[in-house]
């Protein structure tokens, strides 16, 4: 949850990533629940209702945004024309800054000519699924003469050639299994497309997959774009859980990708990358069987290019519907963290510790033992929240915005609730098993452990609108987290790298 802030966005600000003006007729619109409020003397503010946020704007900023709404976008040229004295490059930098803050939504331009795309499917076994995958690719709503479909048969037994008879694909057969990463790299080296699109043979592409995602690469700064990965219609508790909790689905909101962003990586089953960038970065790390997609995105980011997630361009993945398979895969994913931290030591995990929330949890543990001390902790936490509210209200009044006290209080409560949610998620994912064990040995800690480990699944069950019961969802959530945690420990021990368990601590007042 973003804290309430007030700041000045100067008219001359140009972001360092803006190397060229956006191409074509890319459009910008206000994000949902965001409004431009004009003030006196030409200035004003950009106001977000949820999360509660206010950004002060000068006259140029108000002029640029005055014609935008949440329902209709405008091109950069149309926006820049509102303030003729401002250069289009400066206007582009200003809009990009707001997009990064998720206050604006960028709608990519449709290319004048669709670029050639090589679609690469690295396959091992699953002949029927491989044929179905290729058939979905042949049904894409994209100029057929601009598509090359390449299937790398990574030493399948029996070979996949028989399953692909009659389909116009380029089949590369390997007699020795080299793994998905190396197989993809092999195909990329021989591909003829300007763009490389990756998916897996247990996936089905939506008809608009390429048309939805390729336009984002009209921005010369974006090197990789990826879309949503969803599951088929769910039947059963495990399938219903995986449908809303799959680590391949990056959610409903698009935006920049990076280790410090809301979306940290893009899965390789729905990934489009510029071929020249892919080859310059030497492709996927061939020695990685897991986490290779995270590693690729982070290396591309390190080169100075951008990676973007679009909540469109969907791929349907055949999710695991059996509990054992789901837990094994989560453990495998967890085991890749140590390898990734070894390769990217600067991308360590950050753990935010909310001071007021920790005081409330400490009071919960102390109450049976020393209730006066617990009451004092509760009073201190409440006082901290009250002071926070007073400061924010004063800050809002200074920029001319009157927010009702009830609305401000609700915003602060949501913010602290979100902090507790993220704390609970981190603790459950990385330390849940020892916390549970210590709680059994020292019962006063049980209520604290219960709150920490119940808040995230209860919130997710409601937020994600899971089809299974709350009790089943909580149980599967805990099992999933325990499996991932064991995988993290396994990877740490194997690589003798313990950074995944030692996050950077950031305190929140």
Could you say what each language-model-derived stretch is?
Residues 153-161, 176, 203:
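A conserved acidic beta->alpha catalytic loop
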Residues 135-146:
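Short, acidic, metal-binding catalytic loop of nucleotide-sugar glycosyltransferases
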Residues 196:
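Short aromatic/hydrophobic "clamp" motif used to bind/position activated sugar donors
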Residues 310-374, 390-468, 472-480, 486-490, ...:
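Active-site-adjacent helix/loop segment of glycosyltransferases
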Residues 1-67:
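Acidic, low-complexity/disordered tracts enriched in E/D and polar residues
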Residues 174-191, 201, 212, 252-264, ...:
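Glycine-rich, basic loop-to-helix element that forms the pyrophosphate-binding segment
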Residues 208-240, 318:
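Conserved donor NDP-sugar-binding/catalytic core segment of glycosyltransferases
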Residues 50-64, 81-136:
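N-proximal low-complexity "stem/linker" segments adjacent to membrane-targeting elements
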